[in-house]
Amino acid sequence: MLFPTPLISGRLERRYKRFLADVTLDDGRFITASVPNTGSMLGLTAPGSRVWLSFSDAPHRKYAHTLQIVEADNTLVGVNTGLPNRIAEEAILKGLIPDLDGYATLKREQKYGRNSRIDLLLDDGPRPRAYVEVKNVHFIRTPGLAEFPDTVTARGAKHLDELVDVVAAGHRGIMLFIIQRADCSRFGISGDLDPFYARAFERAIASGVEAWAVRCHITENGIDATELVPIEDMRRIE
């Protein structure tokens, strides 16, 4: 996935009100950018961090700049949670996930469950219809181990329960974690940060929901899904 226009670099001053960030650009300008991420962005908001932003002069936009990448631990990390669905689609179409090969139809944002929309729906294939829920991952606290979630996510647990219902109805329920950073070799559920989500994940896997984690390579030009990484046992829930 390529960024449509070259990104602009700068230094993060602060992130605040969840959706805003103050940035000093490399040319000296001080700007306020939109932050397309509703999560905590744990470990990614240190003042002084190198950041990269996209720019749009569309007249309807309140903020012309959008935060796309943060440098953390000498690694570029994608923070735009609007991109993982597109990255996941590209990963599936190029055969990066063999168990999702062979489907002739891929649809986006289809209604299902309890007033929800599934991110990707795969149909007309050699196996039952596959409902794919995509989650963005960018949290690391142990070298090499990417984790989800980085904060409590009741909505994420709800999606897991709906995938269980999908499996019970005879379809495939898929949880696909898109890791927007390259400095990891494995993935795990952070049960100590959200025990409720961890238990929901455990129930889902026991009920037949499938889970995959894909690592990405991030550059100033774009984000590319590169390979599957193994999913480890969850952190122990006290």
From Swiss-Prot:
- GO MF: DNA binding
* InterPro entries named in the record: SfsA, SfsA_C, SfsA_N
**CDD domains recorded for this chain?**
SfsA-like_bacterial
A Pfam family annotated for this UniProt entry: SfsA_N
Signal peptide annotation: none
**Which protein family is it in?**
Belongs to the SfsA family.
* Protein name per its UniProtKB record: Sugar fermentation stimulation protein homolog
What organism is recorded for this protein? Brucella canis (strain ATCC 23365 / NCTC 10854 / RM-666)
The gene that this protein is the product of is sfsA
